[in-house]
């Protein structure tokens, strides 16, 4: 009888967004339970060892986090498998570095360097709005935050700007046509564009049409859309490439151009 939660994760079954090589052993670190889903998170050990190269082994990562040097969303995290996810702010005070976890257009997690000013807040997608005991309204966000007494105009699928020091809502962005958004799932993962229209399909998935700054249009499901700014001005800085997916031919031309300049 298998009782209790799974404790292992095979490397071949690990999410592609972690960019682990197939031949690096049998197992991958299994993220602990936390605010993000297993397949939508990046454990601290992979962040520090495989991406930032601050450690060579898992034991070294453990020594770093146990010194309470790593903060996620302003809170010290000492678990090497802590699941940091989309939009989380990772702070390493000893080196004075701040990162925001975002996706690149190839659907991989990227640690995007940000300024200390930008590290004070994060954007959260509203997953549900409810009324709790004694009639207290509250909303739940994509990173499992519960925020009480929100502005009554905030609805599901909107985005709230949360101050990490207080956990309070500073501002919110409505889910509207004309606002800039990032795609957080599916085939178009990591692309950034402006919402052009929304098709309602009761009983199925609503489809949202998005147009990027190059004029390419694509469609995705409503629950993959994360609004990141009003009109075309995002509230966060974007990683290199600005969320514009190039076609295979465009990528090839760019590579050849870079090669010819060397």
From Swiss-Prot:
Give the matching CDD domains.
Answer: KOW_RPS4, S4
The keyword Glycoprotein is annotated on this UniProt entry: no
Give residue ranges for domain S4 RNA-binding: 42-105
Q: Name one GO biological process term.
A: translation
What GO MF annotations does this protein's record show? RNA binding; rRNA binding; structural constituent of ribosome
One family from Pfam that matches here is Ribosomal_S4e
**What superkingdom heads the lineage?**
Eukaryota
UniProt protein name: Small ribosomal subunit protein eS4
